[in-house]
């Protein structure tokens, strides 16, 4: 009986690394009573790579949006596919809805403010997560920050450094029993592998870096981790019901899908989603 157990102990970490699967395994709440049989079971939570954490999705329209909402998207292009492969995620881009049909984002053309119509046109799939307790004043400050750095460059160096980091950080998922270990491990690798730019010296951003900085400037940080460490997938996993690599200040709320995308539509067709 000893050998099979040893094999399982070796295979489980290997499976987690190869599949880039982040897992949380935790004991039940200490407040649960001893007679509560169900509470004695261990809680196992897997990271959701899809754009939704439940089997059903909610389709929304533009009037459902609020200033400060996060717009996550992917396209059918090669670049989007590559980002999704390396980040083992269903998203490759994140932007901020400013209100009045305007969107702030950082793309290869730099930091821009574009129409929501244009942002939707360039996306195959687009869904919305909301930051809890964001005030109108903070939303206004996010818009002011976007206008201030508009036409700044794109952080190509940060993206190049991010590619090996996204691979090596998967090692931090090998211990599924400690959320603190995983977050400290990822932060340690980020410090070792990624460049650090002083706040006043920053002249360029990639998409999730811009989003993270915008909320920090508004006094409502999404996470205390450095913005240059954060990918679109990291922000997506900060939602309720998911497992995040970096600790969120507050978990994001799923609002709905503006565009389901071809994969979700195909899943509906064969009955995998609804």
Q: Locations of the language-model features?
A:
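Sec-dependent bacterial lipoprotein signal peptides
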Residues: 1-19
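Cysteine-nucleophile amide-bond enzymes
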Residues: 20-274
